[in-house]
């Protein structure tokens, strides 16, 4: 049993009767010492900027990964998750015309709408290469497109918005001196007349492998395939006016089999790190085998007047490509599908003896070995346009499933017609293209089947636009370029 002294009992009785306010006052020194650091820490935490849910984090391979969005490969930089909006302006200076693409990205490089569309897209003809003798006029031809781009970008963001001009096969075909004169005129225009941020190296002739790689990234980005195994990606064939590109992902084993290339030529395989996945991308650009350039190759390849089997009856004239002019008149007996196809095969050099590899496409070029990355093909640009004009694809559809044999069947129908009947049957074909419609369709079928080895009855996807976030985006290489420049800005 505990004993309490009288003094202790008195003290306890005194403490029990003490008011709370008196206690706080008596222990105020202790409270200040304890609570001051707590309050200071809380204040610091309150004032610190909060990272959004989509902030970037470090990926397993040292890649900066957007935690809630898409990501770009090794060139991705910090700060993309800050919720800021950024724009990129990309000019596609092709052989058949000039096009401007304006993209708007959020902090994770996901596309944001521009007005009612997911991008601004405008185009005009002719292309820069049509002004080979007047570089200043070539540059001026871009002014109206530049003005369209400026209209949709807020004034306060224009100075920090990068503008790139990528010239493709048409300008490459002019040679170094003439193409550089045009490019310099464009650089001067952007420096003097544009409110966008430009750098001299951003106005350039794209090499074919860059163009093909950007196109592959664009389509697989929009389809949501990046980050998946290479076998889940799609291959891309892009038929421009001056060149055609083939790009598809291959296995690391096949990448190791890539043959060496001559000095100055692009390597067959590019290694890309995208969404934490390494891809070995086979890509090759075939200069002079775009649709408009191939006409010249076919006209040259004909022995004697063989080429006339590709021209519609009733056409008398010449074909100009670059600085070259070719006779291009039809026979009184009309075109012949089978004879035209023989000329197209010869123009492609399918049996080129220079093939020193196990598998080649045409012209002695290694084909990448094939494989899963090529099984699902997306085929773009002039393939879609001619299919729509020939009537076996809805011209208003963003994409369509077809077979190479559809081009063959359309070619057989067209080659039987004369110019007048073809104009009446295919009203969507421009007057200057009608005489070449038989040739174009024969070439496209021959390119797919004999050139790239696609089965005539394999399903392929003709693509003009790709569905993305309840909208449709142009299936063109500029988006891949825009992602790169936006992520490295």
From Swiss-Prot:
GO cellular component, one term: membrane
Signal peptide: none
One of the GO biological process terms: nucleoside diphosphate catabolic process
EC number of the protein: 3.6.1.5
Transmembrane segments: 29-49
Subcellular compartments: Membrane
UniProtKB keywords: ATP-binding, Calcium, Hydrolase, Membrane, Nucleotide-binding, Signal-anchor, Transmembrane, Transmembrane helix
Bilayer topology: Single-pass type II membrane protein
Cofactor(s), names only, from the UniProt record: Ca(2+)
Topological domain spans for side Extracellular: 50-489
Residues holding ATP: 89-99, 235-245
GO function terms (MF aspect): apyrase activity; ATP binding; nucleoside diphosphate phosphatase activity
Catalysed reactions listed for this entry: a ribonucleoside 5'-triphosphate + 2 H2O = a ribonucleoside 5'-phosphate + 2 phosphate + 2 H(+)
Keyword Hydrolase carried by entry: yes
Spans within the Cytoplasmic topological domain: 1-28
Major enzyme class: hydrolase
Domain of life of the organism encoding this protein: Eukaryota
Membrane found in the keyword field: yes
Active site (record annotation): 211 (proton acceptor)
Function: Catalyzes the hydrolysis of phosphoanhydride bonds of nucleoside tri- and di-phosphates.
Family: Belongs to the GDA1/CD39 NTPase family.
Protein name per UniProt: Probable apyrase 1
């Amino acid at each position: 049993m505990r004993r309490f002294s009288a003094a202790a009992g008195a003290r306890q009785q005194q403490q029990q009767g003490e008011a709370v306010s008196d206690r706080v006052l008596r222990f105020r020194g202790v409270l200040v010492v304890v609570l001051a650091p707590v309050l200071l820490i809380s204040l610091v935490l309150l004032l610190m900027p909060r990272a959004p849910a989509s902030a970037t984090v470090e990926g397993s391979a040292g890649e900066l990964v957007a935690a809630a969005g898409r990501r770009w490969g090794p060139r991705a930089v910090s700060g993309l998750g800050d919720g800021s909006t950024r724009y990129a302006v990309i000019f596609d200076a092709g052989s058949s015309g000039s096009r401007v693409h304006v993209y708007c990205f959020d902090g994770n490089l996901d596309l944001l709408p521009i007005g009612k569309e997911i991008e601004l897209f405008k185009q005009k003809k002719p292309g820069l290469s049509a002004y080979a003798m007047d570089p200043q006029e070539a540059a001026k031809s871009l002014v109206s497109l530049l003005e369209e781009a400026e209209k949709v970008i807020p004034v306060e963001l224009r100075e920090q918005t990068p503008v790139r001009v990528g010239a493709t096969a048409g300008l490459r075909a002019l040679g170094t001196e003439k193409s550089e004169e045009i490019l310099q005129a464009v650089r001067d225009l952007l420096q003097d007349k544009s409110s966008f941020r430009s750098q001299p190296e951003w106005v350039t002739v794209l090499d074919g492998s860059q163009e093909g790689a950007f196109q592959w990234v664009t389509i697989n980005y929009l389809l949501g395939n990046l980050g998946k195994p290479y076998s889940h990606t799609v291959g891309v064939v892009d038929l421009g006016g001056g060149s055609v590109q083939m790009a598809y992902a291959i296995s690391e084993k096949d990448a190791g089999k890539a043959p060496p290339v001559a000095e100055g030529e692009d390597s067959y395989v590019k290694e890309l790190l995208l969404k934490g996945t390494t891809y070995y991308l086979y890509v090759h650009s075939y200069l002079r085998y775009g649709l408009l350039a191939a006409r010249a190759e076919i006209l040259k390849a004909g022995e004697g007047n063989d080429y006339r089997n590709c021209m519609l009856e009733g056409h008398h004239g010449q074909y100009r490509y670059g600085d070259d002019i070719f006779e291009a008149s039809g026979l009184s007996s009309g075109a012949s599908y089978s004879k035209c196809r023989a000329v197209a095969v010869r123009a492609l050099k399918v049996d080129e003896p220079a093939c020193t590899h196990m598998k080649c496409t045409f012209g002695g070029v290694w084909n990448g070995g094939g494989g899963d990355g090529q099984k699902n093909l997306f085929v773009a640009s002039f393939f879609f346009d001619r299919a729509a004009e020939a009537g076996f694809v809805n011209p208003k559809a963003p994409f369509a499933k077809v077979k190479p044999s559809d081009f063959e069947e359309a070619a057989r129908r067209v080659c039987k017609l004369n110019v007048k009947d073809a104009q009446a049957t295919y009203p969507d074909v421009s007057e200057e293209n009608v005489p070449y419609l038989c040739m174009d369709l024969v070439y496209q079928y021959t390119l797919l089947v004999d050139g790239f080895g696609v089965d005539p009855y394999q399903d392929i996807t003709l693509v003009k636009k790709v569905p993305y976030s309840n909208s449709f985006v142009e299936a063109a290489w500029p988006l891949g370029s825009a992602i790169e420049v936006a992520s490295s800005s």
